[in-house]
Regions:
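Hydrophobic alpha-helical membrane-association signature
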Residues: 1, 37, 41, 102-106
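Catalytic core of nucleotidyl cyclases, primarily class III adenylyl/guanylyl cyclases
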Residues: 8-36, 44-102, 120, 126, ...
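Short, conserved phosphate/pyrophosphate- and ester-handling motifs at nucleotide-, phospho-/glycolipid
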Residues: 34, 110, 149
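A short, structural micro-pattern
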Residues: 72-74, 104, 113, 150-153
Length: 200
């Protein structure tokens, strides 16, 4: 798991800010890079030669849909957000850049809502990736949620692609869904183009 994460970062312009006990905080140049990396890693993890002892565990066993393997081995939760950090300083222990600010809290909250094998992001970050070509066909908007320590409700998107679209997940865990009739967000390139025209 750790080896897969670290060996793939450079190809997607990723930088490991922190990695400990199987949890990573990673910075990317653009949300598009982060989306592509997350989905590649989720796919690679299906092909890792996991030990039989691990595969016998309910949280790591093989699952299929039709003839396709949907889960196998460790199921990693991932959360993607974007924004400006308040400040950065080198970690005294590792020397790596450490970032601080509200965006860090949001990233932790979004990642914490995901189930194993699921990748979530906030809708504003999804827009940034979609506007530069990230395909929308297999992603799904799952609604507004109230997150601890975050002032406004956050629209969450489940990010996926053709290789992972057979995965299914239970409802978001640990957050209260917010019902807002004015929330008309859709995962549609047409809607994004309309929004750009209407934007002042």
């Amino acid at each position: 798991h750790d080896a897969v994460i670290r060996s793939t970062l450079l190809s997607f312009r990723g930088y490991e800010c922190r990695g400990e006990n199987g949890k990573f905080f990673i910075a990317f140049h653009h949300p598009f890079d982060a989306f592509r990396w997350c989905l590649v890693v989720q796919t690679i993890l299906l092909r890792v030669p996991w030990e039989d002892k691990l595969l016998q565990q309910p949280q790591a066993c093989n699952m299929t849909a039709g003839h396709r393997v949907t889960f196998k081995g460790l199921r990693v939760t991932m959360g993607i957000v974007s924004g400006e950090a308040t400040f950065m300083k080198p970690c005294q222990r590792t020397g790596r850049a450490e970032y601080f600010g509200q965006v860090l809290n949001l990233s932790a909250r979004v990642a914490g809502l995901a189930h194993g094998g699921q990748t979530l992001c906030d809708k504003n970050t999804w827009k940034k990736a979609a506007e530069v070509g990230f395909p929308h066909e297999h992603s799904r908007y799952i609604g507004l949620y109230s997150l601890r320590g975050v002032m406004d409700p956050v629209g969450l998107v489940q990010v996926s692609d053709a290789s992972l679209n057979m995965r299914s997940f239970a409802s978001v865990k640990g957050a209260q869904k917010v019902i807002d009739p004015t929330d008309k967000f859709r995962l549609s390139i047409k809607d994004l183009e309309t929004e750009r025209i209407d934007r002042p």
